[in-house]
Structures are given as C-alpha cells and as structure tokens.
Amino acid sequence: MRVKLEFQYFEGCPNHIKMQNNLAEAIKGLEDKIEIEKVLVEDEVSAMQVKFRGSPTLLINGEDLLGMPVPEEPSLACRYYPKGIPTSEEIRKAILQKINKEN
C-alpha cells in the first residue's frame, strides 16, 4: 500500500517554496512507496473545502505532519511553525513511520 502525501499551499506565502524543496529531498528513493498531490489553495472557498491549516501544510494519509487539528474556520493564511519549517529529515522520518506502519 502506498502512502499518500498531500502538499497544500498558496502562492502568497513564501515558505511553501522551502517546504516543497524539503519534501522533494525527503522523498528521494521512496517514489515507489508514495503518491503525492500538490494542492494549490487559491481562495477562501478552496481553503474551506480542503480544511486548510495554512500554507504550507503536508498531510500524510490525511493526517497533518505535526498533528495540527483541522481548524474550526479554515482560511487562506500562512502557517506559523514555532520551530521553523519542517526539515527534509523530519519529513522523511514521518513518511517512513507511515510506510512501516502500513506494511
């Protein structure tokens, strides 16, 4: 079974580029074990539809990378990471945990 990654972002938040690069590094060699979808959130309506936690957000099998719950009122906003954007190592570790759990 493949692990599904959903990368949610919007262009108005500059941190999505760094996280997208970290994600690209994190998945090297795992391409046959994952499927990835990039979701561009363009407005408040689409933010509500995807239950947007802010840009950038990575969902792994529908769960937030850092366990952030779905907000009561999703909106088009930049996401604040108190410890900074997740590193490629942190992302890879979380993906591998899901892969190992699924198998």
Role assignments for model-derived ranges:
Residues 1-29:
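Local sequence-structure signature of Cys/Sec-based thiol-disulfide redox active-site neighborhoods
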Residues 1-4, 99-103:
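Compositionally biased, disordered extreme N-termini, encompassing classical targeting presequences
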Residues 11, 39, 80-83:
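Pocket-edge positions in alpha/beta enzyme catalytic cores
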Residues 20-23, 53-54, 72-73:
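Short, glycine/charged-enriched secondary-structure capping and boundary segments
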Residues 34-45:
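Thiol-based oxidoreductase modules, predominantly thioredoxin-like and allied folds used
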Residues 46-50:
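Short, solvent-exposed polar/charged micro-motifs at secondary-structure junctions
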Residues 51-60, 66:
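Structural micro-motif
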Residues 63-100:
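Non-catalytic, surface beta->alpha helical segment in thiol-disulfide oxidoreductase systems
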